[in-house]
Swiss-Prot record:
SUPFAM superfamilies: V-type ATP synthase subunit C. It comes from the Bacteria. One of its GO terms (molecular function) is proton-transporting ATPase activity, rotational mechanism. Transmembrane segments: none annotated. GO terms for biological process: proton motive force-driven plasma membrane ATP synthesis. This is V-type ATP synthase subunit C. The gene is atpC. InterPro entries: ATPase_csu/dsu_sf, ATPase_V0-cplx_csu, ATPase_V0-cplx_csu/dsu, V-ATPase_V0D/AC39_subunit, V-type_ATPase_csu/dsu, V-type_ATPase_csu/dsu_dom_3. It comes from Deinococcus radiodurans (strain ATCC 13939 / DSM 20539 / JCM 16871 / CCUG 27074 / LMG 4051 / NBRC 15346 / NCIMB 9279 / VKM B-1422 / R1). Keywords: ATP synthesis, Hydrogen ion transport, Ion transport, Transport.
Length: 352
């Protein structure tokens, strides 16, 4: 995979204004053109169907590791083959690869483009904050919480690690406040709401509201705003699906999408307003099926954005989703091979 000629490609040059972090509206397309050229090269190094099939066809866990060591994951795989190594070493290797990838993409950008890419990466921060809150409330312990965190966000790993060792949400909020991350105050306010109602849903929706409020303020790229609007609609549909059978609480509405508060209220009665993606979520037979429908809709939206917005953030958005999916699939395959599960069973999990 990739160029083996050893020659250094000639990249499009960024304008002087963009290089000086003075990225204005006029030079944004040139800046994304540069970043997208780099990301297109990175996209060619994602594992294709044949590589994933080879990993699935591995006869053992050790053979699976050998297959991965012949890909661009090789630099991260050294610990996995050490004596006594197991799934924790594989998890660290895959996590480090995802983190390295996101940091490389971020390193291509500056100015407004960098802030918009950071906004995309902050979606993983949002997920991690929810994982952190659930873990602390349920008493899962720092190690378990850390195993379920997604690397690649914008919160420093050391800050997340410290927060995961907290025994209560207030202490976690204090730990997250170090460094002044945009979502730290959002988390603190969400914890206050949880302490009042005792409902994790209130905390999680306040995190959603805070993230999307920040993201829509930062976003200047048209395709990014369009994608965020779609993501907000999907989020509201999932909230409505989780509340099926009861009256929707308007305090749980996440603004910023195509739905207004009244449209959100109608979701409780199954009225999706003709939106096929929302319909699929509302009519899903289970919460798990609804989440699959949501991921499918967002994957489709990201692919569409990459095709329609070749001079904006669409290609980056699509690449980051593909990379996350790649790592998630390899994690599933690795666990299946480690526990010697039947290949067909692993394949079903990967395809789901």
């Amino acid at each position: 995979m990739g160029d083996s000629s050893g020659s250094r490609p000639t990249w499009p040059r960024r304008s002087a204004a963009c290089s000086r972090n003075k990225v204005g509206k006029d030079c944004m397309p040139d800046d994304y053109s540069y970043i997208n050229t780099r990301v297109r090269v990175m996209r060619t190094k994602l594992l294709d169907g044949r590589a994933l099939d080879a990993a699935l066809a591995s006869g053992s866990y050790q053979e699976f590791l050998r297959v991965l060591s012949e890909t661009d994951f090789a630099p991260n795989m050294r610990e996995t083959t050490a004596e006594g190594a197991g799934l924790p070493e594989l998890d660290r290797a895959l996590s480090q690869n995802l983190f390295d990838t996101t940091q490389r993409v971020l390193g291509f950008a500056d100015g407004d483009a960098k802030r918009e890419i950071e906004t995309l990466l902050m979606k993983w921060d949002l997920t991690n904050l929810k994982t952190l809150a659930r873990g602390i409330v349920s008493g899962r312990g720092a190690e378990t919480i850390q195993q379920n965190l997604i690397p690649g966000g914008t919160i420093k790993p050391s800050v997340l690690q410290t927060a995961s060792q907290s025994t209560d949400l207030a202490s976690a909020a204090t730990a997250l406040g170090v460094g002044g991350h945009p979502l730290a105050k959002v988390f603190r306010n969400a914890v206050t709401a949880y302490n009042t109602t005792g409902r994790l849903l209130d905390l999680e929706v306040l995190l959603d509201q805070g993230y999307y409020r920040y993201a829509t303020q930062v976003s200047r790229d048209t395709s990014l705003r369009r994608y965020l609007s779609r993501e907000i609609d999907i989020t509201n549909a999932l909230i409505a699906r989780n509340s099926r059978g009861g009256t929707l609480d308007t305090n749980l509405f996440v603004p910023g999408g195509s739905l207004d508060a009244a449209g959100y209220g109608r979701l409780g009665a199954g009225d999706a307003g003709g939106n096929a993606d929302i319909t699929a979520i509302l009519e899903a037979p289970s919460i798990e099926d609804a989440e699959v429908a949501a991921r499918t809709a967002l994957d489709r939206a990201a692919r569409s954005s990459a095709v329609s917005d070749v001079e904006g953030v669409g290609i980056i958005l699509d690449f980051l989703r593909r990379k996350e999916i790649e790592v998630a699939k390899l994690r599933l395959i690795g666990r299946g091979k480690y526990y010697d599960l039947p290949t067909d069973e692993i394949r079903r999990e990967v395809q789901a």
